[in-house]
Regions:
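N-terminal small-residue-enriched
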Residues: 1-449
Length: 449
């Protein structure tokens, strides 16, 4: 994989200064990927891509502009730089815009093991074999497994190089592998789709393809025979995927842009209790091999591990330099950007610290309630914290999973929901960059028939 070297990035920065820029930064991303999909054993997708792009952010005083290009010859780049400088000169000034304080740039970068040393891009034949194996395992698991939305395997590798006119330069490389399968179970006229996936930076650490297929089949089968329920208030047990979505919503309200726009229910809540005392939510960019790990953020600032919520208390907001300046706070190393866009705010590896309960113990504590396994639509108002989602899952009776339910809506308010977290599971599993164990909320409205 041909990558961009630091010499070219520095030449672009020098050219920007020669053309009149007061400050500049360069982001170069080189990526290669292969995706292979099958449906009912037949090839449905086979796509390979290679790309090198350079993004340039130019400042002319407090005015700025961003451009990107895939033409990396110096003659083309010289014209590209000149055009971006002119765009910055013509843009409106913004008093909050600018590069970070140079003193904040790291002197050294951590080694985070983001690239698989043993595997690169998986071959097309191997990728198709893996996808077929997963789908076949799902369809063979039970006679009621009648159809499939398909299975897909993806592999990729990339290099990120960042440099700015303050003298900071850094780079890192990574790999990623994922497999997803979506089989369909049928019993009479009733059909239900299952879904399961595995992802990792190391090919050898992926869940076995047959196991992924079987899990997806089980999840489809357990949805057959779904019933409707009456409207009531009852406990809800969030499975790990649903719990991860919940904490993503909560932490999204702690994002700088939402805060300075006044569009978050967490405005003014820093240092205050927003959840039960057992709730600690961590954003950790430094987990070796983590799917969201990176040694520096999208503005060249050091990343870190930090408790966003610490024993129920909102301990920090997540900020890039722009939102930090507007809020009068320090940036947190959570800037993220693509080659053609301005920095935004993003989490890295976000997780809810696990508790001591097994999922069986949590379910066993519920006399009557919902084990939540799916939600539909967005339905979260970040300004008020109001939460209302179409949902499905398995009804709990006397501490046991009794029967599937669907066509229901669950509703509450995020602050009330987080304050009502009663039990947290010990089943944290790193399958994505945002994860959580099983958790139980004391009571929510469940609207049924």
């Amino acid at each position: 994989m041909a990558t961009v070297d630091i010499a070219l990035a520095n030449w672009v920065l020098d050219e920007a200064k020669r053309k009149g820029a007061s400050a500049a930064e360069v982001l170069c991303v080189t990526a290669e990927s292969l995706g292979a999909g099958v449906r009912m054993g037949e090839v449905e997708k086979l796509k390979s891509s290679r790309e090198r792009r350079l993004g340039l952010r130019i400042f002319s005083g407090q005015s700025s502009a961003i451009s990107s290009t895939a033409e990396l010859e110096r003659d083309s780049l010289a014209a590209f730089v000149a055009n971006t400088v002119e765009l910055a000169r013509l843009s409106a000034a913004d008093p909050w815009a600018g590069l970070p304080d140079p003193a904040l740039h790291p002197n050294s970068l951590p080694e985070l093991s983001l690239a698989d040393p043993d595997s690169g891009i998986v071959t097309a034949d191997r990728a198709l074999e893996i996808a077929r194996t997963a789908e076949k395992a799902a369809l063979k698991f039970d006679p009621r497994m009648k159809n499939s939305e398909g299975a897909e395997f993806n592999s990729g590798r990339y290099q990120v190089l960042f440099a700015n006119s303050q003298g900071f330069a850094g780079e890192y490389s990574g790999t990623s592998y994922s497999l997803v399968v979506q089989p369909i179970a049928q019993d009479g006229d009733a059909m239900q789709q299952g879904f399961w996936y595995t992802s990792n930076r190391r090919f050898g650490k992926l869940e076995d393809a047959e196991s992924v297929g079987i899990t997806a089949a089980k999840r489809a089968l357990r949805r057959l025979g779904a019933r409707k329920i009456k409207t009531m208030r009852a406990p809800i047990v969030f499975d790990p995927d649903m719990a991860a979505g919940l904490i993503r919503s909560v932490v999204g309200a702690a994002s700088g842009p939402s805060l300075y726009k006044g569009a978050s229910f967490l405005v003014g809540q820093l240092g205050k209790s927003i959840a039960a005392s057992g709730v600690t939510i961590v954003d950790d960019a430094l987990i070796p091999g983590g799917l969201g790990s990176k040694p520096f953020d999208g503005e060249g600032l050091p990343t870190s591990s930090k408790n966003v919520v610490d024993k129920g208390v909102l301990a920090t907001y997540l900020l890039d330099c722009y939102s930090a300046r507007k809020l009068g706070l320090a940036p947190t190393g959570n800037a993220a950007r693509s080659v053609g866009d301005a920095p935004s705010v993003s989490t890295t590896n976000l997780y809810l610290e696990p508790g001591t309960y097994t999922p069986a113990q949590i379910i066993g504590s519920v006399k009557q309630g919902l084990y939540l396994t799916e939600t539909i639509g967005f339905g979260v108002n970040m300004v008020t914290g109001d939460y209302s989602r179409g949902a499905g899952g398995i009804w709990i009776e006397n501490g046991e999973l009794a029967y599937p339910v669907q066509e229901i809506t669950i509703a509450g308010n995020l602050k009330d929901m987080m304050a009502g977290v009663e039990m947290i599971g010990n089943d944290l599993n790193w399958r994505s960059s945002t994860v959580a164990p099983t958790l139980k909320i004391a009571e929510m409205t469940i609207a049924g028939a």
